[in-house]
Amino acid sequence: MDVQQFDFDLPEHLIAQHPLEDRTSSRLLVLEKQTGNIVHQQFTHLIDHLQAGDVLVMNDSRVLPARLIGEKTDTGAKIEILLLKSLGEDRWETLVKPGKRMKPGTEVVFGNGLLRCVCEDVTETGGRIVRFLYEGIFYEILDQLGSMPLPPYIHAQLEDSERYQTVYAKERGSAAAPTAGLHFTKPYLEQIAAKGVQLAYVTLHVGLGTFRPVSADSVEEHVMHAEYYEIPEETVELVNQAKAEGRRVIAVGTTSCRTLETVGRANGGKLVATSGWTDIFIYPGYTFSILDGLLTNFHLPKSTLVMLVSALAGKENVMRAYKRAVEEEYRFFSFGDAMLIL
């Protein structure tokens, strides 16, 4: 399958640079996957499309302030470090700029000595394995010294870092926000629950690979990045009971979708409480084992996420919906508007 089939023209001014003042004031494009019918609404109308008994599954991962600026202890040269993956015991896989300054044995200091790290190794992809040295609680120090690693297509400064977190973010570990959840406020989630919709949570720590373009010409040749996930027993029970009773399971975001499908596909269409790493790649031709619907943002041309939504709703339906979204000047990407596929 040619990657070019998932390309579309996107004017740069439609890439949202700032979150809206009110999370729920974004727009909502509703796409019926069976008919291809498209409806334009405000996000607050999402509740009208949800039914009592639906299970709405959200990713509760919290974005780390993973960008650190420090200095080499020997020369004072500036170093930028981006945390990618915790390896345990204060060791992290990181990206470093400029990489040539960070050889094994190099020590970097942050925040007047509040935090230090030593480079231990170079990865196959050019990253660095570092070990952090500190006194106190690592994540509290990181909150103090680190900054949010915003996506490469957002050029504006973020005034309030909490606007790049969902209101239910809990489990630290993501390098990027699960952005479909940014549209919700706590009161709106309470309204949805009051309608009889069951709210459930999974954790998938979003990696920077989510922004990596597809470099292969053929969809099937693309290799996905791996991300860590967890599914708790409470979510397993809610989802499995819903599937057994013919009720709908709707994922908030592609990360929730990939978590559900990773485990559901491996267990005959049922969930089990588990954790692990997933590199599942969902594209047209994939048969969904758990998912009935998806709330998501508008994604990059030729991205694996456009391929995922095309697998759920049909490529022609999705590309037509994206064309309409551009014509109607929907806001795209992380701080943009939402799309509901049912």
Curated annotation (Swiss-Prot):
InterPro entries assigned to the protein according to its UniProt record, in alphabetical order: QueA (IPR003699), QueA_dom1 (IPR042118), QueA_dom2 (IPR042119), QueA_sf (IPR036100)
Q: Which GO terms describe its cellular component?
A: cytoplasm
Q: Which GO terms describe its biological process?
A: queuosine biosynthetic process; tRNA wobble guanine modification
Per the UniProt entry, the Enzyme Commission number(s) are: 2.4.99.17
* Principal location class: cytoplasm
List, in alphabetical order, the Gene Ontology terms for molecular function in this entry: S-adenosylmethionine:tRNA ribosyltransferase-isomerase activity
State the reactions this protein catalyses: 7-aminomethyl-7-carbaguanosine(34) in tRNA + S-adenosyl-L-methionine = epoxyqueuosine(34) in tRNA + adenine + L-methionine + 2 H(+)
TM spans, by residue?
none
- Establish whether keyword Lipid metabolism is in the entry: no
Q: One Pfam family, short name please? A: Queuosine_synth
Q: In which pathway does it act?
A: tRNA modification; tRNA-queuosine biosynthesis
Q: Which controlled-vocabulary keywords does the entry list?
A: Cytoplasm, Queuosine biosynthesis, S-adenosyl-L-methionine, Transferase
UniProt-listed SUPFAM superfamilies: QueA-like
User: Into which EC class is this enzyme placed?
Assistant: transferase
Q: Where's it found, cell-wise? A: Cytoplasm
Which NCBIfam families does the UniProt record give? Answer: PRK00147.1, queA
What does the similarity note say? Answer: Belongs to the QueA family.
Q: How does it assemble?
A: Monomer.
Describe the function of this protein.
Answer: Transfers and isomerizes the ribose moiety from AdoMet to the 7-aminomethyl group of 7-deazaguanine (preQ1-tRNA) to give epoxyqueuosine (oQ-tRNA).
Name by which UniProt lists this protein:
S-adenosylmethionine:tRNA ribosyltransferase-isomerase
- Source organism: Brevibacillus brevis (strain 47 / JCM 6285 / NBRC 100599)
